[in-house]
Amino acid sequence: MPEPHLTTWQLARDGDVITTPRGQLYPVRLPDGSAAMLKVSTDAEERNGHRLLRWWDGDGAARVLAHDGPALLMERAVPGDCLRDMSIQGRDAQATAILCGVLERLHRPRGAPPDGLLDLNWWFSDLLTPPIALSPLLEQCRSLAMTALEAQIEARPLHGDLHHDNVLDFGARGWLAIDPKRVQGDRAFDYTVLFTNPDLCGPGIQVATDEAVFEQRLQQVCVRAGLERPRLLRWIAASAALSAVWFLADGDAAPVNLAVAAMAVQRLAEASG
């Protein structure tokens, strides 16, 4: 329940609670009347998101106003356009440009990173040592992941889960990221999650699995982020495969992740053949 934090931080409720699989979000007003969002996490890993949000200090990410245990008080996004709808409605290149712009800000050089970040070798442990039998495609992706992890460059703190529902419109402050993981490693990895979205943001969405969309995104991200095509493709295959393993290990299907992984593997094969 949020009551202790509502009292301590002198917050007033300002809308219905939003329940997610990992906690609750409470729209609130600060003592000066400005809008904010109180997030109370029930997931232990989710509670670590404050580390990077506080380190970014509002540059490319939502600003943290207060933090105490599972409770995180942040500035609140404004109603309006969202990247999920933008992509679905045929403006995917615009959504991709916004996501790339946010990552450029998050990846800017800063001081010493916060404590408690985990490296990508740990993040990929379920693909490297899988809890399920892997298909030939996933075995290929596992090999590509090992290659990518061994060849990491430009290591820095990463968002780890930057997709269309994790970048919101904050009005005059622009588009900002929320809900980071606590990982660090090759910056190219941070551009991979967008390739399986917005399809994973909700049922019935079919954007990321379109061959033309995949190719357009690939070209756009390579140019915007200054990434070589093979390097990005290896990370896309690895990232999509890791997510697929998580789905499959939970007994769920993973059609989006498998389709994206296959497109990445196919393009790598074409380039080397």
Predicted regions: what they are:
Residues M1-A61, F170-A172, A264-G273:
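Conserved NTP-binding catalytic cores of kinases and kinase-like/nucleotidyltransferase enzymes
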Residues Q24-R29, V64, S143-F189:
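Active-site acidic catalytic loop and adjacent metal/ATP-binding pocket
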Residues D32-L73, D81-L106:
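A conserved alpha-helical element in kinase catalytic cores
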Residues D43, A71-D92, R105-A112, W122-I132, ...:
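A glycine-centered beta->alpha junction motif in the catalytic cores
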Residues A44-E45, Q94-I98, L137, D210-R217:
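Soluble or luminal CAZymes and related metallo-dependent hydrolases
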Residues F170-Q219, V223-R229, R234, A253-V260:
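Active-site Asp-x-Gly
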